[in-house]
Curated annotation (Swiss-Prot):
MF terms (GO), sorted A to Z: ATP binding; ATP hydrolysis activity; ATP-dependent protein folding chaperone; protein dimerization activity; unfolded protein binding; zinc ion binding
Function of the protein: ATP-dependent specificity component of the Clp protease. It directs the protease to specific substrates. Can perform chaperone functions in the absence of ClpP.
PANTHER family noted in UniProt: ATP-DEPENDENT CLP PROTEASE ATP-BINDING SUBUNIT CLPX-LIKE, MITOCHONDRIAL, ATP-DEPENDENT CLP PROTEASE ATP-BINDING SUBUNIT CLPX-LIKE, MITOCHONDRIAL-RELATED
Binding partners and assembly: Component of the ClpX-ClpP complex. Forms a hexameric ring that, in the presence of ATP, binds to fourteen ClpP subunits assembled into a disk-like structure with a central cavity, resembling the structure of eukaryotic proteasomes.
Family statement: Belongs to the ClpX chaperone family.
One cellular component term from this protein's GO annotations in UniProt: HslUV protease complex
Protein name: ATP-dependent Clp protease ATP-binding subunit ClpX
Gene name of the encoded protein: clpX
Residue numbers binding Zn(2+): 18, 21, 40, 43
Example GO BP: proteolysis involved in protein catabolic process
Residue numbers binding ATP: 122-129
Record-annotated ClpX-type ZB domain positions: 6-59
Amino acid sequence: MSEDRQGRSGDSNKILYCSFCGKSQHEVRKLIAGPSVFICDECVELCNDIIREELEEKAQSARSSLPKPREILEVLDQYVIGQLRAKRTLAVAVYNHYKRIESRSKNDDVELAKSNILLVGPTGSGKTLLAETLARLLNVPFTIADATTLTEAGYVGEDVENIIQKLLQKCDYDVEKAQQGIVYIDEIDKISRKSENPSITRDVSGEGVQQALLKLIEGTVASVPPQGGRKHPQQEFLQVDTKNILFICGGAFAGLDKVIQQRSNDAGGIGFGAKVKSSERKQEVGKILAEVEPEDLIKFGLIPEFVGRLPVVATLEELDEPALIKILTEPKNAITKQFKKLFDMEGVELEFRADALSAIAKKALKRKTGARGLRTIVESVLLDTMYELPSQENVSKVVVDESVIEHKSEPYLIYQAQPAPAKAASGD
């Protein structure tokens, strides 16, 4: 290349030098020409080394920024009350998942298998919040999919590939970011087959969806339409490799406790050697779910292949009244803290009495909505006050007690004391 440039310049005896290190064309193996500059092969190699070192430093920084399981648990504790066992299971599983991604980049001899997660717990026990908090902590793209809207390809409804498209939308169609994101699939128990006989129960929104999700969860290259794909059909589909995407599936699995109990009872046997079943030994649902085995999930209606793709199972307990009261007051995003902030922006103090918090928790337990129903209850009792308050003057405090939660009275408004009018001076 340098000889061609010499020929064009008309000066065949001119010696060319590297613009970076100053070596002549005779001192190096190759001299590459650019617009009025030259670079030798040695400088190219040096540039490659510099770039390689910077990439390794970035990778090392990413490794050091990955929080340890204990640090993950500490953050989860700030947002999710209770569920210690589930939080520990998640912390370890997520930490190992991202370590696995690092090991793949090193071309290690040992290949680590992917460990997706199944969350089993009652409605409102914190499954979705756990997944959201994890994604926020790790600063990775996160999306939630509803399993009940998914159908097999070719039928009316959402294809499973739509999940990956939602994940891409969350990171502005950055494929590299999406490939290390987290997907939470909710209501996974609703796609269970209704019988253990697959030949008569296969349907487009049940077992069929489980089959469609298998490859996606295990790791495959999904073809996803680009941004505005229908408007620009000539664009090529984006190829997203799902092998490093962490899938967390969650569901209430109503009735699973009975399946577990049935297995335990069958294991007890019959006859004189059988264990005596007593009503006093009746366990709480949360403790029963903690004993779940893969065979129980299969009997419930998940196909064996799907259960095998979710090796990490974390069970959540049903929240009791003390736990719900803590949820109302302790987390960073506690509901009472949020409403106090809203009232504070109006210059008004909001107070929840202890009996009010207890009444809110009892009402949520009665509705069987768990923590999810707490906000609805608080919204309903404060709606009229929040409507009237901006138009009222001199209100300094709003007090909510049990009678307000039971709709027996309105929130108590406390007004600022008006300054006494100044007396006019009496004339002599």
